[in-house]
Amino acid sequence: ADFIEPDLVATKDGVLVARHEPNITGTTDVATRPEFASRKTTKNVDGVNEEGWFVSDFTLAELKTLRAVQPLSDRDQSYNGKFQIPTFEEVLDLAKAEGTKAGRTVGVYPETKHPTYHAKLGLPLEDRLLAVLAKYGYTTKASPVIVQSFEVSNLKYLRTKTQVRLVQLVDANDVNADGSMDLTAPYDKPYDFAVAGDSRTFASL
């Protein structure tokens, strides 16, 4: 691989881990763990109510007792139960190790998932991300890191703090037959725009 692309969310104790969403119901075996049954709850993630278990309700130590599973039934299930949830630092270590084996640089392309959601929980992602990147010496445009986000304000904040490359992602509800974006709410705009009452959509970006 040229890059490893982890989606980042925050644990209860503020550690960045790689999960596609804050809700880990489908991507771990948490639903089978009786010791965590009481953690099942409903949270609003970017304007959508979701039921399940959420990373922000678990410490890193608790998350490490869980095992990852493949949520899509049509994909390979043979790795279910074999791996822990990796921290962002573990992903960076993996990239370095694999790069050394291959004799070339393997970059990391992290996405800050749901920044507004995390900020409301008191677990903002940005400074935590910057601290980890600085620990690894990744602070310049030449660093093998590209940070991406569907929101705008957090990227603007990051730009004031680091010179690493940043990418603005765009989303939509679907793609129309003519190739245009189906900008149906709540997938029509960055969530920080929605919270701020900003009328612009992803098409404006």
Which role does the model predict for each range below?
Residues 1-205:
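Phosphate-group recognition and catalysis centered on beta-loop-alpha active-site segments
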